[in-house]
């Protein structure tokens, strides 16, 4: 009985497209050589670079993503669900006066750290007649109490 050599194609076994395990390298003598087997207890330069990148990202959680050499950015793509820190909520003075009591509840309910910034409106554009009717005249306090109940934010 003749001995047959059992061989298999490692390229068909490897499902990852970026994997190089099925590619053969050649020595100077021309003999094909398999790349070394990965062993988790042996630290390579690639492992060190990956570990340093993770540490850097964790040490600066609010840093904006940096550009890579090919122009792409790492991290979440800016969109309607992602925030870029610091987050500022821009309120006009009348809105701030109206929502003064509920500002803390709003910031507690907001999913990220935020700051309320008061924006000065152009007097020609602002329509304060609606807001003036909602306030009582109380000149000894900094904020004006409300006449009507504002909605409660959960």
UniProtKB/Swiss-Prot annotation:
The UniProt record lists the keyword Protein biosynthesis: no
Keyword annotations from UniProtKB, A to Z: Developmental protein, Nucleus
Highest rank taxon of the organism: Eukaryota
Compartments in which it is found: Nucleus
Secretion signal span: none
Entry annotated with the keyword Transcription regulation: no
Organs and tissues of expression: In the late gastrula stage, expression appears in the dorsal presomitic mesoderm and in the first three pairs of nascent somites. Expressed strongly in forming somites and then expression is rapidly down-regulated except in the first somite pair where expression is maintained for a longer period. Also expressed in the presumptive notochord and in the tail bud at the 48 hour larval stage. Expression disappears by the 72 hour stage.
Family classification: Belongs to the ripply family.
Name of the protein this chain belongs to: Protein ripply
Gene source species: Branchiostoma belcheri (Amphioxus)
The encoding gene: RIPPLY
């Amino acid at each position: 009985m003749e001995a047959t050599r059992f061989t298999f194609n490692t390229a068909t076994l490897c499902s990852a497209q970026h994997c190089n395990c099925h590619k053969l390298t050649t020595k100077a003598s021309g003999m094909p050589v398999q790349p070394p087997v990965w062993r988790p207890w042996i630290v390579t330069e690639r492992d060190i670079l990956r570990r340093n990148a993770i540490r850097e990202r964790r040490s600066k959680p609010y840093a904006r993503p940096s550009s890579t050499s090919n122009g792409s950015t790492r991290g979440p793509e800016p969109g309607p669900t992602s925030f870029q820190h610091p987050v500022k909520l821009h309120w006009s003075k009348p809105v701030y006066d109206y929502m003064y009591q509920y500002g803390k509840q709003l910031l507690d309910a907001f999913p990220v750290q935020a700051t309320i910034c008061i924006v000065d409106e152009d007097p020609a554009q602002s329509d304060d007649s609606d807001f003036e009717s909602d306030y009582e005249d109380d000149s000894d306090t900094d904020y004006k109490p409300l006449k009507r109940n504002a909605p409660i934010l959960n």
